Each structure stands twice: as structure tokens, then as C-alpha cells.
């Protein structure tokens, strides 16, 4: 273990690695932009809605995202903030892209939950919070869009507490909303920060009024709003939870901030809280033991593979979360699944689509390894030790289509493209044992569009979909070899191999699946599979 004075300890302790979770349109991409702006990582924050201009948001860089204005793939951005170095993992905001998002949440130590204050808790936020629950991830909450008419702030906090089962501790409190939005009162600092709208890359000077009873406050926001603020705060402070860092770190309590990302207001208050309270890199469970971030030997795992980040290079990048130790250019690593030593000299770090060669990186950082088809999601890299990090899920798809070619001569390219897209988690592919069909499985409809669009632009293959009689899929395994062979013989017409050659049962109806499970109780039918 390390003494807390070593340079390595200093580097690791200033890392904060987090992801943003929200319902589509709650303002997540705008928040991402503004977080980077306050971290001085970009000078011009491009808003996604500016369709006509070339200024697409920095974190949305794939062609299809540029057209639709939604974040379809996870990007990684690193920037300094105060004394910390922040790694922000941007997750797909569109409701369909849950698998990629779920896996990204395995690579972070905390999350920022963005809620549209006009709408409250929405469906996608509920689902993502369930995933963060699996690892008790600490959550910071940002109530967004205060420059619009919003719901009652007390109601919003009650809804978060009741629906998401997490206690709320307000850190800032809004003064008015919509056209009447005047700013926030910072409960911990006992000061009012007045709102002046900043747009794009303008960070406005803040006017601060010290103390809740300061007569300046009445002059600045008007006597009525000032009186309302004092009244609300008396209620709020009596009824809500005090901030407790231990409960926050256990994922049981969330600090709540109010603001408007579009107006560049409140994002810095939230960042101050996040960098102060969120944990530095956390220990991680491997099958063999728990790995601490303070260990000096390198370990890391692949949580995502992204093809063709750079159309000029036609490359694929494996995103590795470093769990412990230091990556140094040119170092040797053990690719555990293959039992192979590899020399890594060209890992990259990210500023959303802008890649820089990494000289070194530390626990908590994300690096990109060039991948020529040998790296898969869930792979572990170490400095020699044989370890397998656990908890990186694959989910059974909920939607299925048969895919076929307009030009039958391109079957080879189609298969290659589909296998690569399935390795990076964009889609799942099933090849039935009894015919030459290719069945594509997805968690959401938009994934199908993405696959066709990427097959065309990256593999020059024109594919079309047809309906297919598949309701669900389950991965199957059995400890009794003899019984498994018998099961395979009897169910040949329902079996398929996925992109990684794992056997799956393809059920035309849920009734069929239930019957198959009843008839073969010794066979395990799994809805998720560890990578």
C-alpha cells in the first residue's frame, strides 16, 4: 500500500471520474458543454440545436449524432477544475441507447443526475438510477431549466425521494423561476448568487449578497421574493436532510443544486460540490480479489469499444478504465483473456473526439487502446497478475429484426460489420444454427437505424430489415454435459450463436420460453451475461 505523500497518491487523489445521467431532453448535452466550459476545456460551447451551423456540440461527434442532435455514443472528456482533474463520461441521451449507458456506469465513481425542473423524475432517469444502485454509486443532483416555469422545488425533491429512494439535501435554493428567476441562495455558504444570463461561452460575473437577512437582498430581488425565500428556507431546512458525506458516498443521499445550464448559471456551484465531495478512484471487485486504486501496479478493464472514431483512420478504440497504477507510453501489459503480453505505445486520451497521445495516465483515467479485433468488452489488462474484473453486463435484447443485403455478394462484409458492431456493443447479432439468417437484436429501435447507417458509411454495405418471429433471447448454459447435449438436440430450431459465439435460445413467444424452461430445469436461461 502507499504512503499518502507519494506523487502517485497525489495524482490519484485529485481524480474525479463521473457520468451524467438524465432523461432525453433534460439538458444533459448542454450541461456537458457547460461543465467543459467552466473547466475551461472549450472556449465556445456549441449547442446541439444549432443544426444549420458547423458548431455541433463538442461531445456529439458521430455523423448520425450530428444530424439528429442526440448523443448516441459515449465520449470521454478530461479537464482540470480547481485542484482536481475531472474525467467526464458522456452517456447517450437518447432513450434507446441503454446498454452502452449501463456499461459506462460501471466505469465511473460517481454520477451527476440532471432533472428537468419543469417535468421532474422521468422514465429513463428511473432506469439509470436502478443501474447506479447495483454499485451504490454516489449521486449529485442538478435541477435544470430554472429559466423556464418549473414545478414547486419542494415537490421536486419529494418526488426524487419517493420515486428514486434517495434522500435529498438541498445545497442551493432557487429564487423565483422563468422570467422571474433571480438566482439561488447557497445554504452552505449563506450567500445569494444573483442570476445574470450568460449564453454560449460567456461566463458572467456573479454578484453575491452575503447573509439571508441582508437588506441588499430585498433591493436586488424585490421584497416579495425575498420574503418568500426566507419563508421557504425555514420550511426546507426544517423538513429536509442535512448533507452527510458518508451517506452520500453510500449512495443514500444526494446533494441538490438548482440552475440553468443554458444560461450558464449554477453549473459551477454543482461542480464545486462534486469535486469537493465525490470520491477519488474507488476499489473494484475482480473475480480473484478486490483491487485498490492505491496499488502501484497497472490494472484496467475495457467497458466500451468504439469503431471508426476517426473516419480518416477507420480504426477501433477500446476504452479502458484504469483501476490501479500508472499507464506509461511503451509499457508492457498482460491481456488476461488471451494470456498474451502486449506492448502499448500509442494509447490515447480524449477531449470528445480530439485525441491526444497519452504519455501517462493514472487510476481513474480512461485511455483508448487501438484495437484490431483482438480486444473485447470486459477484457482485463494488468501488469502481469491474472485478474478478471466483474460486473460489466450484456443485456438480452428486447427487439429483433432479420437483416439482409440488397447485394447478396457482400455477405462477407455484412458479417464482418455486424460482428464488429456487436463487439463494440452497438447491437447484438444472432446466427441461428439451422439456417443462414442473421438476426439483429437491440434494446431500443434507434439502434437498428444506427446499424444500417454505419454499415453503409463504414463498410459500404446496403442492408435492409425484415420482421422476424422472435420475442426474446436468453443465453443458455448447463453443468451437466449430457443433459445439455440432449437439450441442444431437441431445441435445435430455437438455438443461435451470438457475436461472441455464445449459445442463445431464441424464443418466438414468452410462452415458448417458459415452456422450454419448464421442460429443461437443469439448463440456466440468462437474461444478462457477464462480458
From Swiss-Prot:
What's in the keyword line of the UniProt record? Cytoplasm, GTP-binding, Nucleotide-binding, Protein biosynthesis
* A Pfam family it matches: RF3_C
Q: Output the InterPro entries linked to this UniProt entry.
A: EF-G-like_DII, EFG_III/V, G_TR_CS, P-loop_NTPase, PrfC, RF3_C, RF3_dom_3_sf, RF3_GTP-bd
Q: Name one GO molecular function term.
A: guanosine tetraphosphate binding
Q: Which residues form a coiled coil?
A: none
Record carries keyword Transmembrane helix: no
| Localisation | Cytoplasm
Residues bound to GTP are 22-29, 90-94, 144-147
Q: What is its main location?
A: cytoplasm
Q: Name one GO cellular component term.
A: cytosol
Per UniProt, residues of the tr-type G domain are 13-282
Example GO biological process? regulation of translational termination
Q: Where are the transmembrane segments?
A: none
* Family per record: Belongs to the TRAFAC class translation factor GTPase superfamily. Classic translation factor GTPase family. PrfC subfamily.
The task this protein performs is described as: Increases the formation of ribosomal termination complexes and stimulates activities of RF-1 and RF-2. It binds guanine nucleotides and has strong preference for UGA stop codons. It may interact directly with the ribosome. The stimulation of RF-1 and RF-2 is significantly reduced by GTP and GDP, but not by GMP.
Protein's name according to its UniProt entry: Peptide chain release factor 3
Query: Whose protein is this, by species?
Result: Vibrio cholerae serotype O1 (strain ATCC 39315 / El Tor Inaba N16961)
Q: Which gene encodes it?
A: prfC
Amino acid at each position: 500500500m502507499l504512503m499518502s505523500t507519494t506523487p502517485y497518491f497525489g495524482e490519484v487523489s485529485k481524480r474525479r471520474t463521473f457520468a451524467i445521467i438524465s432523461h432525453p431532453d433534460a439538458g444533459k448535452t448542454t450541461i456537458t458543454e457547460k461543465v467543459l466550459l467552466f473547466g475551461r476545456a472549450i472556449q465556445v460551447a456549441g449547442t446541439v440545436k444549432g443544426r444549420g451551423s458547423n458548431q455541433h456540440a463538442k461531445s456529439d461527434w458521430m455523423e448520425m449524432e450530428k444530424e439528429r442532435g442526440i448523443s448516441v455514443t459515449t465520449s470521454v472528456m478530461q479537464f482540470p477544475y480547481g485542484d482536481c482533474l475531472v474525467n467526464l463520461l458522456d452517456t447517450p441521451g437518447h432513450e434507446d441507447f441503454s446498454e452502452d449507458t449501463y456499461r459506462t456506469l460501471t466505469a465511473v465513481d460517481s454520477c451527476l443526475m440532471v432533472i428537468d425542473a419543469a417535468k421532474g423524475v422521468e422514465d429513463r432517469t428511473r432506469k439509470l438510477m436502478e443501474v447506479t444502485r447495483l454499485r451504490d454509486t454516489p449521486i449529485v443532483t442538478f435541477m435544470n431549466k430554472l429559466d423556464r416555469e418549473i414545478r414547486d422545488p419542494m415537490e421536486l425533491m419529494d418526488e426524487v425521494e419517493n420515486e428514486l429512494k434517495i434522500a435529498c439535501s438541498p445545497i442551493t435554493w432557487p429564487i423565483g423561476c422563468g422570467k422571474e428567476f433571480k438566482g439561488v441562495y447557497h445554504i452552505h455558504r449563506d450567500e445569494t448568487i444573483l442570476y445574470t444570463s450568460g449564453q454560449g461561452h460567456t461566463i458572467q460575473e456573479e454578484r453575491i449578497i452575503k447573509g439571508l437577512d441582508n437588506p441588499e437582498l430585498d433591493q436586488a430581488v424585490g421584497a416579495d421574493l425575498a420574503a418568500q425565500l426566507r419563508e421557504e428556507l425555514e420550511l426546507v431546512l426544517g423538513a429536509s436532510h442535512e448533507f452527510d458525506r458518508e451517506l452520500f458516498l453510500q449512495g443514500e443521499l444526494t446533494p441538490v443544486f438548482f440552475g440553468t445550464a443554458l444560461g450558464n448559471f449554477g453549473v459551477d456551484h454543482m461542480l464545486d460540490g462534486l469535486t469537493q465531495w465525490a470520491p477519488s478512484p474507488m476499489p473494484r471487485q475482480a473475480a480473484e480479489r478486490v483491487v485498490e486504486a492505491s496499488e502501484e501496479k497497472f490494472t484496467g478493464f475495457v467497458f466500451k469499444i468504439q469503431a471508426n472514431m476517426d473516419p480518416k483512420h477507420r480504426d477501433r478504440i477500446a476504452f479502458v478504465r484504469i483501476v490501479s497504477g500508472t499507464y506509461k507510453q511503451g509499457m508492457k501489459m498482460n491481456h488476461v483473456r488471451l494470456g498474451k503480453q502486449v506492448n502499448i505505445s500509442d494509447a490515447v486520451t480524449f477531449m470528445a473526439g480530439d485525441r491526444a497521445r497519452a504519455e501517462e495516465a493514472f487510476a481513474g483515467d480512461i485511455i483508448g487502446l487501438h484495437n484490431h479485433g483482438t480486444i473485447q468488452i470486459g477484457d482485463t489488462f494488468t501488469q502481469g497478475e491474472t485478474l478478471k474484473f466483474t460486473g460489466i453486463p450484456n443485456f438480452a435484447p428486447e427487439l429483433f429484426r432479420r437483416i439482409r443485403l440488397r447485394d447478396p455478394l457482400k455477405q462477407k462484409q455484412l458479417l464482418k460489420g455486424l460482428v464488429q458492431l456487436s463487439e463494440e456493443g452497438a447491437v447484438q447479432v444472432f446466427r441461428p444454427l439451422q439456417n443462414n439468417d442473421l438476426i439483429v437484436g437491440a434494446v431500443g429501435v434507434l439502434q437498428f437505424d444506427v446499424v444500417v447507417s454505419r454499415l453503409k458509411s463504414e463498410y459500404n454495405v446496403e442492408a435492409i430489415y425484415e420482421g422476424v418471429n422472435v420475442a426474446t433471447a436468453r443465453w443458455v448454459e448447463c453443468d451437466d454435459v449430457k443433459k445439455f447435449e440432449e437439450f441442444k438436440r431437441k431445441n435445435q430450431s430455437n438455438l443461435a450463436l451470438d457475436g461472441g459465439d455464445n449459445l442463445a435460445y431464441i424464443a418466438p413467444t414468452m410462452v415458448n420460453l417458459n415452456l422450454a424452461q419448464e421442460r429443461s430445469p437443469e439448463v440456466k436461461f440468462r437474461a444478462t451475461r457477464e462480458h
